[in-house]
């Protein structure tokens, strides 16, 4: 139940911030119709990749034994699902956080980054533990 609430909260946060930014008529928004780093792929391919990645992350998450190693996988699911839903519902992913020199990004991108860092960190700790 906690996992569903975790993902649901961050999906809500992603879309709440997006709605607020649109309402604020922010000038720093970018409607990204391509993929990461501007890679142009058809939307059906994004959908297939997203579903495949979601299944992979779900399987990995089910293998985890504690919240410490579980949350990074949930962050990846929430971030990926947020961007996937946004692309399917609106035709593009709105990026609205601009921190130079980084590319413009959004809440889902933060979740994806934090999830990857968390997974790498937990793998490092497991390797260190097993010697």
Q: Where do the language-model regions lie?
A:
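Alpha-helical transmembrane bundles and membrane-interface segments of multipass inner-membrane proteins
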Residues: 1-131
